[in-house]
Amino acid sequence: MEALKQGSDALFILLGGIMVLAMHAGFAFLELGTVRKKNQVNALVKILTDFSVSTVVYFVVGYGVAYGTSFFVGAETLAAKNGYELVKFFFLLTFAAAIPAIISGGIAERARFYPQLVATAVIVGFIYPFFEGIVWNQQFGVQAWIKALTGEEFHDFAGSIVVHAVGGWLALPAVILLGARSNRYKKDGGVSAHPPSNIPFLALGAWILTVGWFGFNVMSAQTIDKISGLVAVNSLMAMVGGTLAALLVGKNDPGFVHNGPLAGLVAVCAGSDLMHPLGALVVGAVAGALFVAMFTLTQNKWKIDDVLGVWPLHGLCGLWGGVAAGIFGSKALGGLGGVSLSAQLIGSAMGVAWALLAGFALYGLLKATMGLRLSQEEEHEGADLSIHRIGATPEREVNW
């Protein structure tokens, strides 16, 4: 029976890893559909290469920083318990690699290629796993300190703060230091419209992300005996809540409608194992409305050119999710309890502060040394031709 359980656990978390790996295709198509036609190839190449760099760096450095585990041992040791530690690494890597995928959407259309790969290596090798280890591996006694202070540890079941808020708040300094796309904001105060280039691909990306998210949340249990149908249904309710709120607040804009489920899912990650499904519906709905309102505000009023709205989507909805776990996870609102609002506020604030500090330091250093931005000419030509020397649909075809 023990051998069967070990095999089942390894399969369970492997399937989760595969589902979250598929989410990276979702990130790619969501970005492809949102950016202008001249930057579509760049969106695809960025997501794949960021994932590849993330894998190597997380295997060699990042996983060890978070969990104190080294893979520099014989394969015989690694294969123990059906290779459970290896597939656990695979699963958690897909989370780590989501951070550069999130940032990619914010800095689209004008960022240089290789400086961002360097940023990916630093983020996945140190910045993200440092905070991941604090929350999910009890490092530096921070969780014990929060528990002594508030009576409960900071609870983030599937990463509203650890993954999404950290990714979104890392992206904000990158977007600010990079500056807006050329001619995005006019001297008279007007804003040039850059509508999504391909709504069907944007929708495809959103759907792939949404389906994969059930692996992201449910498989965060990490062993099959801890699987919870509550997590699955709460994810579903938050997804539809986010969609309907974005539909209403966004006035049936298809870009907002397809980001709505993502906003809801970002927010429900932290407390999906605690909330009542109706609580999850409310959390998702608030996130959907929050995304639409803050995307419009950042782009039009504050003139922060965050192309995919990754700061509102992941940064703010993730922050809301961290706090919401402390509200809707409580027994008073039908949750399972065992969570403290003050602990959630402390842990959420720590994640945001760490990401902002690290983001400004990293991207500020890269801007000073390598430069972050394409030249005006390269940006005008488009990242596809200036970086990759080919467009999404080349105009010239060879006459055979």
Language-model-detected regions and their locations in the chain:
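Hydrophobic alpha-helical transmembrane bundles of multi-pass membrane proteins
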Residues: 1-400
